[in-house]
Amino acid sequence: TEQDPVRFANLKPVEATIQVNAGQAKEISKHLIGIFFEDINYGADGGLYAELIQNRDFEYTPTDRGNDQNWNSTHSWSVQGSDATLSIATENPIHPNNPHYAVFDVNAAEQTALMNAGFDGIALKKGEKYDFSLFGKVLEGKGGKVLVNLVDKDGTIIGQTAVNVTSKDWKQQKAVLTATSDAVAASLSIVPQAVSKYALDMISLFPQKTFKGRKNGLRADLAQTLADLHPRFVRFPGGCVAHGDGIDNIYDWKGSIGPLEARKPLRNLWGYHQTRGLGYHEYFLFCEDMGAEPVPVLAAGVPCQNSGTCAHHSKDELTCMGQQGGIPMEEMDQYIQDVLDLIEYANGDARKTVWGKKRAEAGHPKPFNLKFIGIGNEDMITPVFVERFKMIFDAVKAKHPEVTVIGTTGPFYEGTDYEVGWDLATELGVPMVDEHYYVEPGWMIHNQEYYDHYDRSKAKVYLGEYAAHLPGRPNNVETALAEALYLTAVERNGDVVEMTSYAPLLAKDGHTQWNPDLIYFNNTEVRPTVGYYTQQMYGQNAGTEYLSSTVKLNNGWDAVKKRV
């Protein structure tokens, strides 16, 4: 009250009488509380994905970051010493999807080093082991032993191992380092012991202690913080990332699976780079490790409604994006097949299907049991969208009726896209739609009846992105209480609202494109917000039925009743 004497004037204790009518029970969805992960705010590379080396693939490009010329293939790399040079080459790469690699021309043995400081430094823990790997070959000379050091910011070596780079063809080398002390901002140092010209790529450093101990896994403390929410599902990879900035930037799930060196990196529309080391297979594994349903989201044949990028296509026709265009119709059959192939990758027989075999080759012969798939995200419901969405929806429904398709109704709780999106869902019989809205706490207080009047015969609702926003965008007690209050109304409408997920989820200090977020972090700390504990309260104490009740207050204030 001292902080806000106007709004909280004349507050007094309130006595409430609650009468429960057990005969008016509604089932609450078992999937009500989940999480939505998008690579925004460095949520993946430099965040949840445990890789410690930045730009390990030498694929950074100025177009990742608004044509920033410093954001290039050598970003995050430096040469220590004057007797070596670093350049970038593209002849005979490891894989066409990974065309750039480093050429480290060493003219003085043992005196020069190739350095990488990771994402704002490399955090290390004393006694813990780290997996190092690189692909290398010798372009000139014989090559030889290469020292690999972990170096603290004062220059002290706090971990060392060695590999041999002598092959004339690409060959992967692996080693393990043990940190001899803690470090907050260490660097990786690669020191050739022989004068030669080396080609290097996919230089990686991974903690062995990842979430559930998985190789190519997730940062243990961040992943555990998410798991502690007890999410019933995970929506991924976006959001705007899913349908991208222009057609060429649509998230191609096939480019995110398979050997890491063969994955296709992608510009992140939030202004940085996606290695896609955290790809679809890893998302499925994360869901499995938490006991959560996977909810992948694929573009509905159109890019993000805010796209500013133009793209060339198969007929060299310049097509400007946004919702002014979509995937050319002559390419839609292949795109639809890609959607169907994803379902086969998740659920297909490991011996009898092409993509089921690929899943097994990745180490997971058992199906992931995919039950939901999102098509579209906050799209403008234009004729271009409708035509393509219908094609995809009909194909999935015909081939996989067991999979629930989740449609979209735009980015707001009202307006043209919301109304037309709902009309389209009703016309096609879409079983669930994805609603998004970011609103003031007052809206949540005064719209607790929002879903009371929804037609129960129509599509179920997935409230896929929501949050209470105040001026300055804090995540505080006021926003958390408003969200908690609104979730009680959502539970009351558990026969309509099937799923909910707060957004955004993660934000790294110094690399934030959006506020508020549920969890803030740096390389050594994870800081859940007040809103996190609202989500955790509902996730860890999920109800199965809503019992109708009435509340009587001793002061009769309706304004207070809305907040109880």
Which positions does each model-derived feature cover?
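Active-site groove signature of glycoside hydrolases
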Residues: 191-193, 207, 237-240, 297-305, ...
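Hydrophobic faces of well-ordered beta-strands that scaffold small-molecule active sites
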Residues: 31-37, 232-236, 294-298, 371-375, ...
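Catalytic-core region of carbohydrate-active enzymes that cleave or remodel glycosidic bonds
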Residues: 285-286, 390-404, 422-541
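Active-site beta-loop-alpha junctions enriched in small/polar residues
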Residues: 38-40, 236-241, 299-301, 375-380, ...
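Carbohydrate-binding surface patches
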Residues: 562-564
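Extracellular and organelle-lumenal recognition/adhesion modules and their flexible linkers in secreted
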Residues: 1-276, 293-295, 310-322, 328-333, ...
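Conserved, mostly hydrophobic/aromatic
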Residues: 35, 58, 134, 230, ...
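An active-site-proximal structural segment forming one wall of the substrate-binding cleft
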Residues: 177-189, 195, 210-231, 275-290, ...
